[in-house]
Amino acid sequence: MIGSVKRPVVSCVLPEFDFTESTGLGKKSSSVKLPVNFGAFGSGGGEVKLGFLAPIKATEGSKTSSFQVNGKVDNFRHLQPSDCNSNSDSSLNNCNGFPGKKILQTTTVGNSTNILWHKCAVEKSERQEPLQQRGCVIWITGLSGSGKSTLACALSRGLHAKGKLTYILDGDNVRHGLNSDLSFKAEDRAENIRRIGEVAKLFADAGVICIASLISPYRKPPDACRSLLPEGDFIEVFMDVPLKVCEARDPKGLYKLARAGKIKGFTGIDDPYEPPLKSEIVLHQKLGMCDSPCDLADIVISYLEENGYLKA
């Protein structure tokens, strides 16, 4: 950041912009006059700050314009104005803003309009190479008290010992921040899982082995998360532990509160748990017959090794 600027320093120079050498490229920051109707960077008076690197002017006939964010130059694909359909939500509505010029193709996803997917030049396979592993999501599901978080930590420790990079998205931990606005109503639980699924997908795309540990009481939301990832990269681990075993453990005292009516909608008591139907790994535990967390983690690690996830 430069001076009192409170947002990323961004510069954009297209052929239609009035760019001159008088911008003072040798200085730490300068400005470029933009068209009055240019609103990509807010409602400022047609002026945008520059910094770190000199702006790059697109040459006549070029198919890209150059953008700088904190000194990083990125190129965006353009369309000819003839490609623009002003009646379509998948393109810019105002095609006449720069007559005869090329425009970026945008789209609508959910409630987000006029957005553009920027494909990075560094592919997932390249990000995985220095890590010597394949990014994936290990989704641990089961009743409260079934040992999900314990397994997640043991698995993370076991993989760390092998020099592998992991990150745990724990159901409770995520509700301390990202999902602190969500309750435990059915619709909020579904949104909780959706958000965690999207974050887990980003970790996997970065080459990280992401371990998501949460109850996931209904089948549909985790299945939707599975569809976000390439085939095989969503590995569901079902902690198949009977309710009576989980209730006997009751590490947080939640079953006792639920039985006393002090917690409503508690999974396994007055709200259903739908066991997954197509888990890659099912870990069975019974009363008096429970493997250690390290033994369970070894089962998951063996699966990862056999399926090539612990090498690039």
UniProtKB/Swiss-Prot annotation:
Its main location: plastid. Keywords: Amino-acid biosynthesis, ATP-binding, Chloroplast, Cysteine biosynthesis, Kinase, Nucleotide-binding, Phosphoprotein, Plastid, Transferase, Transit peptide. SUPFAM superfamilies: P-loop containing nucleoside triphosphate hydrolases. ATP binds at G142, L143, S144, G145, S146, G147, K148, S149. GO terms for cellular component: chloroplast. The active site is at S216 (phosphoserine intermediate). InterPro entries: APS_kinase, P-loop_NTPase. It is found in: Plastid, Chloroplast. GO terms for molecular function: adenylylsulfate kinase activity; ATP binding. Pfam families: APS_kinase. It catalyses: adenosine 5'-phosphosulfate + ATP = 3'-phosphoadenylyl sulfate + ADP + H(+). Pathway: Sulfur metabolism; hydrogen sulfide biosynthesis; sulfite from sulfate: step 2/3. Coiled coil: none annotated. Its EC number is 2.7.1.25. GO terms for biological process: cysteine biosynthetic process; hydrogen sulfide biosynthetic process; sulfate assimilation. Transmembrane segments: none annotated. Belongs to the APS kinase family. Catalyzes the synthesis of activated sulfate. This is Adenylyl-sulfate kinase, chloroplastic. The lineage of its organism: Eukaryota, Viridiplantae, Streptophyta, Embryophyta, Tracheophyta.
